[in-house]
Structures are given as structure tokens and as C-alpha cells.
């Protein structure tokens, strides 16, 4: 971190392990410098002085800030899937169940016994079962902000034997008068004109193939067979819309450039 103080930079994207970004920020602003900083770690996601960088949901919070906290990859997948329902007042008081699956790159670059090829190939496993994953408080905080009431998440992450991509199956209970067509219309209206959110037509399902190597989140909506019960399938590439691509999108916003620059 000390080496950064000798470099005058206009912008910096920090892709460091959790707990290491704060020292680098201090070095970057040493001597009165004020660069644009996007932090991909979890260090500043709960800091009110940092803009929470999921612009499809938080554009109204952006007011020229030069510090952006990138959302977590699981978090972005879940929030994009639930935001329209939250805004419409359709999130339940009870828990929302999220069954999440991620490619191995979501576990980081350091090999472990559980992420080694021999452990992952031909296998499917859970980890951080319960309320343990660090993205759970982040999801709950943002959903409470959008819905106006506390939201509890039951979240189970799984490790997929693929290199990249996240697929979340989300079980949503709304007021019984909400129909699948009404839910789809709500999502269609919310994401109209968003270049990086794709809402599939009813009857189609989201797959990793829709999003791998793109900065796009693809969402499909399904009936669970009873009034007000729905299944949402949300997918994105954890290395792009869930990390580096989202950082570029945020950097574009901070410099007044088209959000899609470098990402199409």
C-alpha cells in the first residue's frame, strides 16, 4: 500500500482480498490526492460515505461521489432479481429462500481442498450453509432499503464444477392477487432500457449460457403453482457483472461516459 502514495493516479480499481483495501485507499489519497476509486472487496459496502455501485438499483443515490463499493457477486444476482418486487411492496415479512450456485472462480484464486479440480470435477457441494455467508447481511441491508421493512434471507451457496457463472433460484411469496403476468410487467417496466439486465419472456428459463463472458444479468420468472408463489431464476458472470465488468460500468458513470463503454 505504501508504494501507491508515490503514484499520482486519476482512477484506481482495487481488487484485493477483504480487509486490505482501506490501507490502499489511505495511500491513494495521501498528500491531498482525490482519485476515483472502485473497491471490489467487501471493505466499504456498509460505509455510508461510499456509493453502493449497482446502478440499475442505486442511480438515485449517486451524486458525484468518487468512492464506489462494488456489490458482492451473489448479492448483485439476488438484488437484481428481487428489486422490482421490493419496490412494488411485494416482498414478504417471512424469509426469502435463495438457492445459489457459483462456478469455482467465485471461491477466489487460492486453491483449497474443496476447490481443487479433483474435488470439484463431477461434484456439487454446499458451503457456508445457514446465515454464514458474508453476502447475506449485504442482501438483507439493501432489500430493507428498497422495500421499507426488514427482510430475512435464507441463503445456501453451492459450488458448481464450472469455471465461472452464478445461478440463483429464488422462491418468492407475494400477495395472492399478484399474477405471473403482473409480476413480469413490473419487472419489464423496471428494467426497460437497462443495457445489462435481460428479462426473458414468460416460458423461458435463465441459464449460465445467457451470461458467461458478458456484463449482463438475465432473469426469468416462473409460477410455483399456487396464487402469489413464484420462482425467480437470476444468472450473471461472477467475474464480469459480479466483479470486473461492474467496476468498469461504475467507472464509466463516475467519468460521465456511457455505461456500456468497453463492455459491449
Model-derived features: where do they sit?
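Predominant activation on well-ordered alpha-helical scaffold segments within soluble catalytic domains
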Residues: 79-86, 136-140, 184, 188, ...
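NAD(P)-dependent Rossmann-like dehydrogenase/reductase catalytic/cofactor-binding core
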Residues: 216-264
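N-terminal Rossmann-like NAD(P) cofactor-binding subdomain of oxidoreductases
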Residues: 1-123, 127-129, 148, 222-225, ...
Amino acid at each position: 500500500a505504501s508504494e501507491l502514495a508515490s503514484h499520482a493516479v486519476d482512477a484506481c480499481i482495487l481488487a484485493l482480498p477483504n480487509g486490505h483495501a482501506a490501507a490502499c485507499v489511505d495511500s491513494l489519497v495521501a498528500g491531498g490526492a482525490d482519485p476515483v476509486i472502485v473497491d471490489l472487496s467487501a471493505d466499504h459496502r456498509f460505509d455510508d460515505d461510499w456509493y453502493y455501485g449497482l446502478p440499475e438499483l442505486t442511480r438515485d443515490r449517486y451524486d458525484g461521489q468518487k468512492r464506489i463499493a462494488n456489490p458482492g457477486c451473489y448479492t448483485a444476482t439476488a438484488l437484481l432479481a428481487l428489486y422490482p418486487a421490493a419496490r412494488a411492496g411485494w416482498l414478504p415479512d417471512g424469509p426469502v429462500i435463495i438457492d445459489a450456485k457459483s462456478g469455482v472462480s467465485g471461491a477466489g484464486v487460492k486453491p483449497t481442498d474443496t476447490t481443487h479440480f479433483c474435488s470439484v470435477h463431477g461434484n456439487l457441494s454446499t458451503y457456508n450453509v445457514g446465515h454464514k455467508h458474508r453476502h447475506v447481511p449485504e442482501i438483507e441491508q439493501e432489500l430493507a432499503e428498497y422495500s421499507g421493512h426488514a427482510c430475512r434471507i435464507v441463503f445456501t451457496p453451492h459450488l458448481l464444477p464450472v469455471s465461472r457463472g452464478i445461478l440463483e433460484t429464488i422462491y418468492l411469496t407475494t400477495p395472492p392477487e399478484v399474477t405471473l403476468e403482473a409480476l413480469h410487467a413490473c419487472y419489464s417496466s423496471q428494467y426497460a432500457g437497462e443495457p445489462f439486465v435481460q428479462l426473458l419472456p414468460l416460458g423461458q428459463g435463465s441459464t449460465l449460457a445467457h451470461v458467461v463472458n458478458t456484463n449482463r444479468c438475465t432473469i426469468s420468472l416462473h409460477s410455483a403453482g399456487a396464487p402469489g408463489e413464484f420462482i425467480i431464476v437470476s444468472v450473471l458472470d461472477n467475474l464480469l457483472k459480479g466483479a470486473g465488468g461492474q467496476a468498469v460500468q461504475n467507472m464509466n458513470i463516475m467519468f460521465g461516459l456511457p455505461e456500456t463503454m468497453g463492455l459491449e
